[in-house]
């Protein structure tokens, strides 16, 4: 039943009620019915993702840790596309960090980031942050802890110093709270990407040192057991130890070759300084905003070309990076020499064991030769006795049976013994028998 309008009176409402109850009013009402609002369109059916797509997406996502230069840290579960947008790297450079692909250790320098792939350390370093792949892995945890402990203590940089120097005091003049020594100390601090590279190489070298120390202790114990008892079990342990040393040597050699390649390539070394462009832009902005105050740094190539003094000159960056890589190159070379020493110790022990085995084999050959000579003498005596022991009947046999038999056996035995002595004498003079 239709309700009366709000602006009608009570009588009109009653008339409207009575009118609505008649059949004519029903027909009129059906004719003059106000059309209803159109229904909203149906939502398109949701796209159902199949199990295969969900599994593929879950397989492509990996755990990353983002750490900025201020010490801010967070865990991110993302795929390669997010990392590519975040770091500005192409997809082909991200394949280097894939653990499924067997790639040699590499340090790639790109326009906006540096890709570090050194054994278990897989990271992307930009001018302001570092992305570490699989930070919760057992071998990566020392590297992650080193980063988290270091960067909160090293959050002061030149930009903060310059900003603090331009704060005004109550009198409206520039504050001089920061001394020149503090500015110089901030300037001498390593760039962010160099510090991350330093920690990565340090973590890899510490892992190598720990591994070679464990292998050295294992080698001493295994080789001592081998010298006491040459058994199949001890020989298998030595073979396993040599295989581990070979794998470790190949790994150290690859990292050493990569560091040596960067040291020899000046262009690649220059491209590793990813923070210089960002710092150069910040210094340009600070110089425009505060032209009265500039940091006292001389011998800058950018200053000579543009008249703007920057934080760290490019020559100084290249020199610092060269010293850093050269130090780790020497350390890797020392680790490789330690591996060579352990391998040489194993080889020397194997040579000693081989000499002992050869001696045992010679003794066995001498014993075999002795048995052959003795068997030859016995065989001759047996052959002669068998040849003259035919059972031929003779009428005078019972008279002469005891006379020639003893002499014949004695003469035959003496002859065979003489042959054996002659053979032993020949073998002794020709050193065919061991002393």
UniProtKB/Swiss-Prot annotation:
InterPro entries: MRS2-like. GO terms for cellular component: membrane. GO terms for biological process: magnesium ion transport. Keywords: Ion transport, Magnesium, Membrane, Transmembrane, Transmembrane helix, Transport. Residues 20-54 are annotated as: Disordered. Gene3D superfamilies: 2.40.128.330, Magnesium transport protein CorA, transmembrane region. It is found in: Membrane. The keyword Lyase does not apply. It is a multi-pass membrane protein. CDD domains: Mrs2_Mfm1p-like. Signal peptide: none annotated. Its main location: membrane. The chain crosses the membrane at residues 369-389, 408-428. Pfam families: MRS2-like. The keyword Ion transport applies. Belongs to the CorA metal ion transporter (MIT) (TC 1.A.35.5) family. This is Putative magnesium transporter MRS2-H. The gene is MRS2-H.
């Amino acid at each position: 039943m239709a309700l009366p309008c709000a602006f009608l009176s009570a009588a009109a409402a009653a008339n409207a009620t009575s009118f609505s109850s008649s059949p004519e009013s029903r027909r009129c009402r059906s004719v003059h019915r106000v059309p209803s609002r159109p229904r909203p369109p149906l939502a398109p059916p949701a796209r159902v993702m199949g199990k295969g797509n969900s599994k593929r997406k879950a397989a492509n996502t990996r755990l990353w840790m983002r750490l900025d230069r201020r010490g801010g840290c967070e865990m991110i579960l993302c795929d390669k596309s997010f990392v590519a947008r975040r770091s500005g790297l192409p997809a082909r450079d991200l394949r280097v960090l894939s653990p499924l692909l067997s790639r040699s250790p590499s340090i790639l320098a790109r326009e906006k980031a540096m890709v570090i792939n050194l054994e278990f350390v897989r990271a992307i370093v930009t001018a302001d942050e570092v992305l570490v792949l699989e930070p919760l892995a057992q071998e990566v945890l020392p590297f992650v802890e080193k980063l988290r402990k270091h960067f909160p203590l090293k959050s002061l940089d030149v930009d903060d110093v310059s900003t603090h120097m331009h704060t005004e005091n109550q009198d409206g003049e520039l504050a001089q709270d920061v001394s020149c020594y503090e500015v110089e100390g901030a300037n001498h601090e390593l760039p962010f990407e160099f510090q991350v590279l330093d920690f990565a190489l340090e973590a890899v070298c510490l892992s190598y040192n720990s591994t070679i120390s464990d292998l050295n202790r294992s080698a001493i114990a295994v080789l001592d057991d081998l010298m006491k008892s040459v058994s199949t079990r001890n020989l298998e342990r030595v073979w396993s130890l040599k295989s581990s040393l070979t794998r470790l040597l190949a790994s150290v050699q690859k990292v050493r070759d990569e560091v040596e390649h960067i040291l020899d390539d000046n262009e690649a070394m220059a491209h590793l300084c990813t923070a210089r462009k960002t710092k150069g832009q910040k210094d340009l902005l600070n110089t425009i905003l505060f032209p009265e105050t500039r940091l006292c740094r001389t011998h800058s190539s950018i200053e000579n070309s543009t008249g703007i003094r920057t934080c760290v000159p490019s020559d100084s960056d290249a020199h610092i990076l060269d010293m850093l890589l050269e130090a780790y190159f020497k350390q890797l070379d020392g680790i490789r020499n330690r591996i060579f020493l352990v391998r040489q110790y194993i080889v020397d022990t194997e040579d000693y064991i081989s000499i002992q085995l050869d001696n045992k084999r010679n003794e066995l050959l001498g014993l075999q030769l002795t048995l052959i000579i003795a068997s030859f003498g016995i065989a001759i005596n047996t052959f002669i006795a068998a040849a003259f022991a035919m059972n031929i009947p003779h009428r005078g046999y019972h008279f002469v049976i005891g006379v020639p038999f003893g002499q014949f056996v004695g003469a035959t035995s003496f002859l065979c013994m003489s042959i054996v002595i002659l053979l032993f004498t020949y073998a002794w003079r020709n050193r065919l028998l061991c002393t």
